[in-house]
């Protein structure tokens, strides 16, 4: 296990909290453990904010969860498999873990995936500190695996970036990840599909639209519309993506939601992001 002083140093370097760095370190080892298991490696495609940071853009915002799409609809995340993942993490890092929750996800009485919460006692502690009961641990990782998702682009092989003094295994030298276009098309759909308005979705679309190279927005729009139809949703106009209600909600939550994931000096004002996204959405969907 890395030392607490490394967590402290990285927190100062990135201008975020120690708990954010501790979780980032732990996330890397969870990805490593998951892709060290053949059944996971063969079925799972890494996606989401942690994928963007770990596999595409090393100085991207920090993330909190692990998200995957399974290309095998028969894949099962049961307690035995999850404990196998945990055992690998513990063996490689010395991290103490506690399985908090494992849930079957369902929609209209049909299984759609799995969500797990694993508490961890990470590196942000003195080595001689005895961990309290897991009920008092405040750090955890959420893992979500979706079984039924329409993928429009081939996955791409990426290496997991791990900016810490310990090392990951060769299992993550190449792992299957979402194409950036796939990420963006799902982020667009999330603006409509989520039951809550997530500032990170707006930030991710804004950031990738500005800094990702050679994006084909016609392909992304097509994929977005296909994904909407796959979920039984209809796109009627950009007011579904940005409207007074969502803007007010996101603006109020902007700093609280993203402030622990990005240094304050790097976090753009929501009004700047909103202005850029209005222009982007009007350009992409001008014929709809």
Where are the regions a protein language model picked out?
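Glycine-rich beta-strand-to-loop/alpha-helix junction loops that act as flexible
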Residues: 46-50
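Structured mid-to-C-terminal alpha-helical surface segments
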Residues: 1-44, 54-60, 64-66, 70-288
């Amino acid at each position: 296990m890395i030392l607490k002083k490394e967590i402290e140093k990285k927190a100062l370097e990135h201008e975020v909290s120690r708990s954010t760095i501790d979780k980032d370190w732990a996330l890397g080892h969870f990805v490593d453990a998951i892709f060290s298991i053949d059944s996971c490696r063969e079925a799972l495609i890494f996606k989401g904010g942690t994928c963007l940071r770990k596999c595409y853009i090393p100085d991207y915002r920090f993330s909190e969860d692990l998200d995957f799409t399974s290309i095998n609809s028969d894949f099962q995340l049961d307690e035995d498999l999850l404990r196998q993942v945990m055992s690998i993490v513990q063996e490689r890092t010395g991290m103490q873990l506690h399985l908090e929750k494992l849930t079957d996800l369902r929609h209209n009485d049909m299984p759609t995936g799995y969500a797990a919460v694993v508490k961890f006692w990470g590196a942000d502690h003195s080595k001689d500190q005895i961990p309290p009961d897991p009920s008092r641990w405040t750090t955890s990782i959420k893992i979500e695996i979706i079984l039924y998702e329409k993928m429009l682009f081939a996955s791409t092989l990426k290496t997991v970036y791990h900016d810490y003094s310990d090392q990951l295994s060769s299992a993550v030298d190449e792992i299957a990840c979402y194409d950036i276009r796939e990420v963006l098309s799902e982020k667009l759909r999330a603006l409509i599909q989520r039951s809550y308005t997530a500032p990170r979705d707006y930030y991710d679309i804004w950031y990738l639209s500005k800094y990702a190279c050679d994006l084909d927005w016609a392909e992304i729009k097509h994929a977005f519309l296909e994904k909407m139809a796959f979920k039984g949703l209809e796109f009627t106009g950009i007011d579904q993506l940005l409207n007074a209600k969502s803007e007010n909600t996101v603006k109020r939550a902007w700093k609280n939601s993203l402030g622990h994931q990005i240094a304050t000096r790097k976090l753009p004002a929501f009004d700047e992001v909103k202005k850029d996204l209005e222009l982007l959405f009007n350009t992409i969907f001008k014929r709809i």
